[in-house]
Structure formats: C-alpha cells, structure tokens
Amino acid sequence: HIDVIFNKICEIKGLTDQLFDYSLACNEEALELDAPCNMESAIGDYLSEMAFILRENSFSLDIEKLIWKDFKITVNSNFLGRIFNNITNNICKYADKKAPVCISSIYRSKDAGIEITNHIADKSSLFNTTGMGIRNITLMMKQMNGRAIVSHNNTEFRITLWFSRA
C-alpha cells in the first residue's frame, strides 16, 4: 500500500510542478533574460545533470553529435532548468532503456538547436500523458525567443530546442 501511496504522491507533485511551470510560462510580463553567453556555457551544465540522472536510471547515451561551437545565445536560467528537468523526467517515464538517448547539436546561421531523441518503451503510455509538460516547454522557449519542435511516431520521440543567436 505504501508504494501505491508514494507513486500517487509523486504523480500529484509532478502535476503541481507542471501547473506552476504553466503559470510561469503564461506570464505576460517581459521575461528577463541572462546576459548573452556561449551555448556550451548556457546549456552544458543542464545537459551534464541530465546525463547523470539518465545514467543513474540505467539509460545509455549517444552524444557523438553533440558538438560545441562558438555560438552565443540568450536564455533565462530558471526556465532552462525547468525545461531540462521536464525532458529528463519524461525520458525516465517513457523511454526505452534498451536504446540509447541521443543528444546532438545543430547549428544554422541564425539559430542553434539541441536535439534529444529516445525510443519509446510503451506506446500506450503516451496516451496517459496530459501533454502539459511539452506545452510548458514550448511556451518557455518562446519567451526566450526560441522554439521547441516535437515529433514522435510509434517508436521514437524527438524534441529540438532552438535558440536564437544573440
């Protein structure tokens, strides 16, 4: 019984966190962004923390295509932490541990992206999600003058976080 109660508490906490993120992301006031900095400086620690948590949860990582270039972006550290926390939690819930989580970087002239791809463990689990976390990520990225592109099929989930050049 204690396991059931604990799982329900974790579920309620997750939903509460998502509602809080949503209220932050929907705030109409101009978001204060951090000073422009190199993409690795802005994102590297969040990716390292995500990698640590995923490895602790028995996931393997493929980071061969994660390359850092001299590319300045402007972010809000609070939002970025929430975004990567959400992505990490979703991977832990829905990803297949038998396939590596792939993290790569993409550079274009006016923007750069971090793409995270994983195989889906159980297709039916995607129907039990509210989708609020992805909506929150999309709203937060928009407030940072970026965007989140999400795609998935029956076997794979992909999210790309696009950051505008500062």
Language model: regions and residue ranges:
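Short helix-loop "hinge" at the ATP-lid/N-box region of the Bergerat-fold HATPase_c
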Residues: 90-92
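Glycine-rich/acidic phosphate-handling loop/turn and adjacent ATP-lid/helix
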Residues: 114-132
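Detector for a conserved hydrophobic position within an alpha-helical segment of the HATPase_c
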Residues: 141-142
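Conserved glycine-rich
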Residues: 146-147
